[in-house]
Amino acid sequence: MDNKIIKKVGVILRPSSPQLKSGYEKLEKIFSSYSIEVLIEDKSAKMIGASGASFKKICNECDFLVSFGGDGTLISTVRKSFDYDIPILGIHAGNLGFLADLSLDELDSFVEKITQNRYKIDERAVLEATVIKNEKEIKMYAFNDVVLTRTRVSNMIHIETLVNSRSFNTYYGDGVVVSTPTGSTAYNLSAGGPVLFPMSNVFALTPICPHSLTQRPVVLPGKFTIEMKTSEERALIIIDGQDVHELELGESVHIKLATKTVKLMHKEEYNYFDVLKEKLRWGE
């Protein structure tokens, strides 16, 4: 997007949040003051009583997307826009997020800098999970994480894991989190996994409540592929905490970093470690 003139942006609002109407009106006014047209996605528009455009239309016509809400809204926006390779700006609706790190009060200054080509774009890794069902290949993409877990809360699960087609480990516990660097501060962190720098070319494999103190998180190079399967019962594959798929006995899921990436827009002075310190309250 170097030296590209920004003419049009698409906006997605946090679902079930009609109180964001006034914030959206302020946002639209700011962009319009710099001669930038704003399109709002259909569902968001309906929520606040405005007219909108289809998600496909705004992805095809706009220079970037604006996710207005929180990290969950941004993740949903990322997942819907995977195939369009369009940058996304996250604006939080009150609380600083790991991903939605710009406030509405900062938007005017940010848009002015956009017109001067003064902003930053990070490229973030995405996980690709593949399952073969009825001789059909099903691909799923995760921005944060892929979780393999049990179908019943009262049971533990055995997960056989291979790395680059070689036997690696068998996890016995509540499941396994496979996390991107971006997702390392989400479920992965809660499960005791490491914080990964978001632009690094690696991913993490973290057991959830393992029934052994020797089962520890592992960080793997981005070019590696892991395969996971269960030998005793069905399992659930959960993508970014939003989509759930069943893994039947005899089936396996292959997970690796995808060739596609996600582009996130930030302020010129954005520093990931400043956000990390504030969110995790380090140094307090």
Curated annotation (Swiss-Prot):
Q: Which residues bind NAD(+)?
A: 71-72, 144-145, 174, 185-190, 242
Entry's Gene Ontology cellular component terms: cytoplasm
Names of the cofactor(s): a divalent metal cation
| Keyword flag Cytoplasm | yes
Q: Which residues form the active site?
A: 71
Top-rank taxon, per record: Bacteria
Q: Name one GO molecular function term.
A: NAD binding
Catalytic activity as recorded in UniProt: NAD(+) + ATP = ADP + NADP(+) + H(+)
Q: Which HAMAP family match?
A: NAD_kinase
Protein family membership: Belongs to the NAD kinase family.
Protein name in the entry: NAD kinase
* Organism field: Sulfurimonas denitrificans (strain ATCC 33889 / DSM 1251)
Q: Which gene encodes it?
A: nadK
